[in-house]
């Protein structure tokens, strides 16, 4: 089942990639600092990420960890 979170995070990751950045690095920076500057404004990604549940986002990024 596709959730609202799944839809939003996909849109955010696509915007980050389209802006020329690597999604994991940017999302990791955002969750570790809380600074929204890590998220591009492209396609409203910065506003969209603010609507996501913080714990759900943190779990998602932890699962993405390439290490």
Role assignments for model-derived ranges:
Residues 1-67:
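Intrinsically disordered, low-complexity, basic-enriched segments
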């Amino acid at each position: 089942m596709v959730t609202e979170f799944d839809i939003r995070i996909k849109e955010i990751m696509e915007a980050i990639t389209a802006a020329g950045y690597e999604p994991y690095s940017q999302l990791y920076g955002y969750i570790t600092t809380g600074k929204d500057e890590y998220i591009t404004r492209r396609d409203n990604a910065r506003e969209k990420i603010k609507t996501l549940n913080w714990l759900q986002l943190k779990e998602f990024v932890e699962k993405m960890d390439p290490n």
